[in-house]
UniProtKB/Swiss-Prot annotation:
Organism: Mycobacterium tuberculosis (strain ATCC 25618 / H37Rv)
Reactions mediated catalytically: Ni(2+)(in) = Ni(2+)(out)
Regulation acting on activity, per entry: Export of the fluoroquinolone antibiotic norfloxacin is inhibited by the proton ionophore carbonyl cyanide m-chlorophenylhydrazone (CCCP). Nickel may influence the extrusion of antibiotics possibly by facilitating the proton motive force-dependent efflux process.
Keywords assigned by UniProt, alphabetized: Antibiotic resistance, Cell membrane, Ion transport, Membrane, Nickel, Nickel transport, Transmembrane, Transmembrane helix, Transport
Coiled-coil intervals, chain numbering: none
GO BP term, pick one: nickel cation import across plasma membrane
GO cellular component, one term: plasma membrane
Record protein name field: Nickel transporter NicT
Subcellular location per the Swiss-Prot or TrEMBL entry: Cell membrane
Length: 372
């Protein structure tokens, strides 16, 4: 039993650490082809159609500058802390299940961008009734979409945080047994794989996230807050004339550019974390060492950002005021997102340095049984 478990684990590790297959290269190529297409459609529309038309919005030129603003908003929003936490933690979960999820960030950002694009399409098709509510922070539409989006985002991050807490406790227990020499390699692998407590509580949800594309609806739900949609809509609707005089292609190029920027960086983030975790899953000792560090960081990030979102939502709904609540409400999640990305990259780099110079694998790998 233990031998077959170890054989399955070695097969899984070999699968994750081998070179990309032709099918995986094909999927990566399709992802980046979509990203390139978004860039081409967005920028060619701006440069070849919008800019030569000399359109104006609120007395100001509507051209490359506005397109660059939309693109920059997409790049910036890719570093939102909730994006980083959701993508990186889901990558961990799928890799621990034996998958190689190359497109988690890609599908998450596509789902998020769909909300923005859908709003723009409604504007183009004449549903001007949503213009005022989307522009107005105190409107009922803005209120309830923000409530729904933030609640889903915070709850998802807490769910991911709980998942990682349970995983972390199990890994620490395995590590303690390893240091005492109580288990051989096969038993250690069995302990790492027997993390079924989470399934008892969150089985349906965790089982549903088995493919990278499952992050598309998650990204869509995250986008229901209309925070980013409002940024794009305000670009189009600013001024008293709103979007009344603009052609459809001028309006739709903005969410396309927004999606291009966000998809690019979210895809790079997901791919980077995929290969970083791939190194960690190649042997039992690496899994223990790396996962204690990174899972602890994942727990901290998910629970921190989830707490900020949910506490801010509760304080806003209940009208709580004071120095702490004012500080909490003023936190910039974009800045936090950049910090989170740096923390993940730095943790990976430090883990590799300590691994190399501390001879961790040599010191922690159980000695082979010499009686057989």
């Amino acid at each position: 039993m233990a031998s077959s478990q170890l054989d399955r684990q070695r097969s899984r590790s070999a699968k994750m650490n081998r070179a990309l297959t032709a099918a995986e290269w094909w999927r990566l190529g399709l992802m980046f082809a979509v990203i390139v297409a978004l860039h081409l459609v967005g920028w060619l529309t701006v440069t070849l159609l919008v800019e030569p038309a000399r359109l104006s919005l609120g007395g100001k030129a509507f051209g490359i500058g506005v397109g660059l603003t939309a693109y920059t908003l997409g790049l910036r929003h890719a570093f939102d802390a909730d994006h980083i936490a959701a993508i990186d933690n889901t990558t961990r979960k799928l890799m621990s299940d034996g998958h190689r999820p190359l497109a988690v960030g890609f599908f998450f950002s596509l789902g998020h961008s769909t909300v923005v694009f859908g709003l723009a399409v409604m504007l183009v098709t004449g549903l001007k009734a949503i213009v005022g509510p989307v522009e107005n922070d105190s409107s009922t539409l803005h209120h309830y979409t923000g409530l729904i989006g933030t609640s889903i985002s915070g709850a998802f991050l807490y769910l991911i945080g709980i998942l990682n807490v349970i995983v972390l406790v199990g890994i620490v227990r395995v590590f303690a047994h390893l240091r005492r020499g109580d288990y051989d390699e096969a038993e250690l692998e069995q302990q790492l794989d027997n993390r079924g407590l989470l399934i008892r509580f969150l089985g349906r949800f965790t089982k549903s996230l088995t493919k990278s594309w499952h992050m598309y609806p998650v990204g869509f739900l995250f986008g229901l807050g209309f925070d980013t949609a409002t940024e794009i809509a305000l670009l189009v609707l600013a001024g008293t004339s709103a979007a009344a005089g603009l052609p459809w292609y001028a309006i739709l190029c903005l969410p396309v550019l927004f999606a291009a920027g966000m998809c690019l960086l979210d895809t790079i983030d997901g791919s980077f974390m995929n290969f970083a975790y791939g190194w960690a899953f190649s042997s039992p000792v690496r899994k223990i060492y790396y996962n204690i560090t990174v899972t602890g960081l994942s727990v901290a990030v998910a629970l921190l950002i989830g707490s900020v979102e949910l506490l801010g939502l509760i304080a806003n709904q209940l009208g709580w005021q004071g120095p702490f609540w004012d500080w909490l409400g003023g936190l910039d999640l974009n800045t936090v997102g950049f910090v989170v990305v740096a923390m993940f990259a730095l943790t990976w780099a430090i883990a590799l340095l300590v691994w190399h110079y501390g001879r961790v694998e040599e010191r922690w790998t159980p000695a082979p049984d010499r009686t057989t």
